[in-house]
């Protein structure tokens, strides 16, 4: 029974590989976002204990590291929708499934690390707002710069998924050229 599962989803089709890639991107992005929010919220809690009136200004800075989890989810849904995971015909060959596994891992790692870095940058911005509340608008710019690379990873994952699942994609056999 297990052998049949492996054969159907990993050998005959690449659906299992693609599903693993989709889940890994969600896992990495979700863990990174949770850690990033923890860093920012911990810093904000200290500030709010003395200046509770800053809650509205600090809320955005606390929430910013959570966007990577959403970007990972979008990447996973995109993989799932292009491979037959969400219904329809399974059209992904094993080699494309493996490639999508690496797309998911790549996006997931960038989302994971950028969420943590964004949490650290948000914590620094929270300290700025604590000392100079009128600088809240400028303080948001610092963690938003880290966000740029999370968006780049999402766009790269979407483009790679589109290219890899293009039905007109043909794979050349380099061994046949020398024969």
Task: Go through the PLM ranges and name each one.
Residues 1-179:
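Hydrophobic, small-residue-rich transmembrane alpha-helices and their short perimembrane loops
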């Amino acid at each position: 029974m297990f052998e049949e599962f492996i054969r159907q989803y990993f050998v005959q089709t690449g659906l299992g590989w693609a599903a693993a890639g989709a889940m890994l991107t969600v896992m990495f992005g979700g863990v990174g976002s949770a850690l990033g929010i923890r860093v920012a919220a911990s810093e904000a809690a200290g500030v709010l204990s003395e200046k509770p009136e800053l809650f509205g200004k600090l809320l955005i800075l606390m929430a910013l590291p959570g966007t990577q989890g959403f970007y990972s989810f979008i990447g996973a849904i995109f993989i799932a929708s292009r491979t037959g995971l969400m219904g329809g015909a399974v059209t992904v060959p094993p080699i494309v499934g493996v490639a999508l596994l690496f797309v998911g891992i790549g996006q997931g790692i960038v989302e994971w690390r950028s969420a943590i870095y964004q949490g650290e940058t948000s914590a620094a911005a929270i300290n700025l707002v604590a000392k100079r509340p009128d600088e809240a608008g400028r303080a948001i710019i610092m963690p938003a710069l880290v966000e740029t690379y999370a968006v780049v990873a999402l766009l790269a994952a979407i483009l790679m998924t589109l290219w890899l699942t293009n039905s007109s994609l043909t794979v050349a056999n380099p061994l046949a050229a020398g024969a």
